[in-house]
A protein has these predicted regions:
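STAS-like cytosolic regulatory interaction modules
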Residues: 1-51, 58-97
């Protein structure tokens, strides 16, 4: 299961972000993050599959529809491999700046 911990404008995502978790989070996707969230810090994600990546990109899309830029920063080592494998580098930032 994934956990979302809000710390001001940053939300720290940890745990498992897989298909099963995404199914349980999907209906709340529009309200899972505080409106002031500017970045999702992903270093503590233990495992993320394609459904998890799609969920993260959906959160970015929801914020973009409101005219807000939501950044995906500091992906975990496991997530970095997935990002490289599927050429998703344009969507993620190595470290929070």
């Amino acid at each position: 299961m994934a956990e979302f911990k809000q710390q001001g404008p940053v939300c720290i995502v940890s745990g498992l972000l897989d298909q099963q978790t995404v199914r349980s989070l999907w209906n709340d996707r529009s309200s899972i993050l505080a409106p002031e969230t500017a970045a999702l810090q992903l270093a503590e994600i233990e495992y993320c599959d394609s459904a998890g990546v799609a969920f993260l990109l959906e959160l970015v899309s929801i914020f973009a529809a409101k005219g807000i830029s939501l950044k995906l920063v500091s992906p975990s080592e496991q997530l970095k491999k997935f990002i490289t494998l599927y050429d998703l580098n344009d969507f993620f930032i190595e470290e929070a700046k």
